């Protein structure tokens, strides 16, 4: 399944009945959020608002509102197939030396595929069909959503921010929300450890007092967007990874005003800079936690130039109490994470990030336990192996007889296999999500691990319980006579 740009993907979804065009006039101020939220919670389609009130540019919402659509965006026909994406990333993250000539020959196609997916630079691009500069730059013409009643203003929610540090050849792609505060000014809310913020900091050290070039793509193709939120190895660019997902090289074009390369097929490109010391208070905004975040200062992105396709489409979303679109993305990307973790920790059977836990704040791990204390090693591994889990506050580790995705199973294991004093691990003064107001200090808090595995000799002095299970022969006999008993059971049984 191939698509070249966002419009191809929209056509694919529409052909499958997975996109609904809304012709009625809908206000980007609050109304779109309510419609998208109801649709997402019901597992409904992507929405194309063709007549946003006060604007001439259509708005695409709820694009990744189901795990199945995320899988399609990553070039896969099913959510389960995302495990294959994870296996590829696991291999690229830590490739094993070939065990012999035959093994090297078998791995050669993978390396060739990766090497052949470097982005293709083009001289002419749809994203630069229309060029607006000077006084013509006016962000007020974009139907930017105001998502919640207490929001400080309109918020750009799907920006693909392109930066490059002074000592780096490859660019960084990141998604950082941006508050509109003027016709050509947006607050860039990137946290200090994110790639864009690190590039900015290094640039300031290398070129003190000089403006930092930035480009922002709006409405890039799904593979490129999803590549920016996937744990891509540092040796692989997000553009190359997007090409692997898409099955075709990512086409990029150089910006008109700087040397950054942006997706050639994007609907909009914003070119500009961040001036040293230009900061503004950002927020409050309703966030993926289900609360409004506190106000804090972040750099201001000054837009010098807007380029866009003819008849452009504005891609947007909202964040709120799960489930929201980031939570759905988390459910799908969960399948990508599993093989990556299993590469480092083969004892892991399953790994689950419950969407109710804001996609990353809680993790449940099932494992094949091999020695006393093994669960604690896995806890530490989850917190340290991938930077995506540095903010995970709660890690629950159970044996592989427990279904990590069934709370009834997990709670049973926790209440029957845990002693709170012996089987919890508390780690203080660790990195915590800036948005987590429950932590005593902004960005710094504690983590806790729960060992809900069966305890081995050395971990307990008591005789351990044996789980109850019916004999299989009895179950088979009852299966054979069940229909004749005439007992009607609910389908959920």
Curated annotation (Swiss-Prot):
Pathway: Cofactor biosynthesis; ubiquinone biosynthesis. Its EC number is 4.1.1.98. It is an enzyme of class 4 (lyase). GO terms for molecular function: 3-octaprenyl-4-hydroxybenzoate carboxy-lyase activity; metal ion binding. The keyword Kinase does not apply. One of its GO terms (cellular component) is cytosol. The keyword Zinc-finger does not apply. Binds 1 prenylated FMN per subunit. Mn(2+) binds at residues 172, 238. Disulfide bonds: none annotated. Its cofactor is prenylated FMN; Mn(2+). Coiled coil: none annotated. One of its GO terms (biological process) is ubiquinone biosynthetic process. SUPFAM superfamilies: FMN-binding split barrel, UbiD C-terminal domain-like. The active site is at 287 (proton donor). Prenylated FMN binds at residues 175-177, 189-191, 194-195. It is a peripheral membrane protein. It is found in: Cell membrane. It catalyses: a 4-hydroxy-3-(all-trans-polyprenyl)benzoate + H(+) = a 2-(all-trans-polyprenyl)phenol + CO2. Keywords: Cell membrane, Decarboxylase, Flavoprotein, FMN, Lyase, Manganese, Membrane, Metal-binding, Ubiquinone biosynthesis. Belongs to the UbiD family. Homohexamer. Catalyzes the decarboxylation of 3-octaprenyl-4-hydroxy benzoate to 2-octaprenylphenol, an intermediate step in ubiquinone biosynthesis. This is 3-octaprenyl-4-hydroxybenzoate carboxy-lyase. The lineage of its organism: Bacteria, Pseudomonadati, Pseudomonadota, Gammaproteobacteria, Cellvibrionales.
């Amino acid at each position: 399944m191939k698509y070249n740009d966002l419009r191809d993907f929209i056509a694919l979804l529409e052909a499958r009945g997975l996109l609904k065009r809304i012709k009625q006039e809908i206000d980007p101020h609050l109304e779109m959020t309510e419609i998208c939220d109801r649709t997402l919670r019901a597992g409904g389609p992507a929405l194309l608002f063709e007549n946003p009130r006060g604007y001439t540019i259509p708005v695409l919402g709820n694009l990744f509102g189901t795990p199945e659509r995320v899988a399609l965006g990553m070039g896969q026909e099913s959510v389960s197939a995302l495990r294959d994406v994870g296996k590829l990333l696991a291999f690229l993250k830590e490739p094993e030396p070939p065990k012999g000539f035959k093994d090297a020959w078998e791995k050669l196609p993978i390396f060739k595929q990766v090497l052949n997916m470097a982005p293709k630079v083009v001289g002419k691009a749809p994203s630069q069909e229309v060029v607006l500069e000077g006084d013509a730059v006016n962000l007020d013409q974009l139907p930017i959503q105001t998502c919640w009643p207490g929001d400080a203003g309109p918020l750009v929610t799907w920006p693909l921010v392109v930066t490059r540090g002074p000592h780096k050849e490859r660019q960084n792609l990141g998604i950082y929300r941006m508050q509109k505060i003027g016709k050509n000014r947006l607050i860039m809310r990137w946290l200090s450890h994110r790639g864009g913020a690190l590039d900015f900091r290094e640039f300031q050290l290398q070129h003190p007092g000089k403006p930092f070039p930035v480009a922002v793509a709006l409405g890039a193709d799904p593979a490129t967007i999803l590549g920016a939120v996937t744990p891509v190895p540092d040796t692989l660019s997000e553009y190359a990874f997007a090409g692997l997902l898409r099955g075709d090289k990512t086409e990029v074009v150089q910006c008109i005003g700087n040397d950054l390369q942006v997706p050639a097929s994007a609907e909009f490109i914003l070119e500009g800079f961040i001036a040293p010391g230009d900061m503004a208070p950002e927020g409050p905004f309703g966030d993926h936690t289900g609360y409004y975040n506190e106000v804090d200062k972040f750099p201001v992105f000054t837009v010098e130039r807007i380029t866009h396709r003819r008849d452009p489409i504005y891609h947007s979303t909202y964040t709120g109490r799960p489930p929201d679109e980031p939570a759905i993305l988390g459910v799908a990307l969960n399948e990508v994470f599993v093989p990556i973790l299993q590469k480092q920790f083969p004892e892991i059977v399953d790994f689950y990030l419950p969407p109710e836990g804001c996609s990353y704040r809680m993790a449940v791990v099932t494992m094949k336990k091999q020695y006393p204390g093994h669960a604690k090693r896995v806890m530490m591994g989850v917190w340290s192996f991938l930077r995506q889990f540095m903010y995970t506050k709660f890690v629950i580790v159970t044996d592989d007889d427990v279904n990590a995705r069934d709370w009834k199973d997990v709670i049973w294991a926790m209440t029957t296999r845990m002693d709170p004093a012996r089987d919890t691990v508390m780690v203080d003064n660790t990195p915590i999500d800036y948005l987590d107001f429950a932590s005593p200090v902004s960005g710094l808090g504690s983590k806790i691990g729960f060992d809900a595995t069966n305890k081995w000799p050395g971990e307990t002095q008591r005789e351990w319980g044996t789980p109850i299970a019916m004999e299989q022969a009895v179950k088979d006999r009852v299966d054979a006579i069940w229909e004749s008993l005439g007992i009607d059971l609910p389908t959920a049984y």
